[in-house]
Amino acid sequence: MTLCIAWKQDNAIHLAADSRLTIATNSYADVGIKVLALPYRILQPAHPDPSRARNVAYQGRLGMCFAGSAVNSLMIKESVAAVLQDLQYAPGYTDVSLKGICEFIFKAYKLISIEICKTAAGPKGIASFIVCGQCPSTSLLRAFKFSTNSNNVHSLDEVLVSSNHEFLGSGAAHVDPKAALVRNRDYLSVLRDMIDDESIESVGGNIQYGTLHNNDFTVYGIIEFKDGVHHWRGALDMNSDYFMSAQSDLISGISYIDPFNTFGRSSAV
């Protein structure tokens, strides 16, 4: 499983997660990408003249974070990413709110989840996730949780409405309900402490983090000072010699945050 955290603060929505994938019983790999940006595009109706280019009515980048089955999460992620870039709407009829977009995603989620849970994976094939974005209809920042219970009943619920945060995954049961969660760093500290707690086997690896500002979700790498300086994006240390040794190689252009003041300076969050 995992721990994913969504919270609303400073006119933004933040998503964070660990990197651990549960492969089988007592078998883990800290290589999952659980926080990601998901571009979407909604096109105007097709023009009668097929040679005319389609106009884009709405577009942006949603944020997503996953918990649960690695197989289910991957299939949902791949399927949804493929179709969200070419949606179409009918003016006056189609719901182009963020809820409408999430209801479209929810249809794919149910279909894929049912098929995965029919296999030998059974209940272990269950996955849950959160999607956040700026609503095309209202320009408000909103977030929705996609979940499945033990009876394979699927739910779509808006979150970050009555509460400023939402915890998702097996790690949620270990969060101290009395924890003081005020700053962005407080949420990341909860995640870091759980990753460092070896008694919580389902949560581990490196922190992943992204922020939704206006209509754009940006994923950041994490700077860590531990046996040297590391610049993590999931399991990948992007500034390591492995990636930086050849002058002719492409390098990562991702931005990084230093949430725990590794170098004694203010963090980006």
Spans of model-derived segments:
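N-terminal nucleophile
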Residues: 1-269
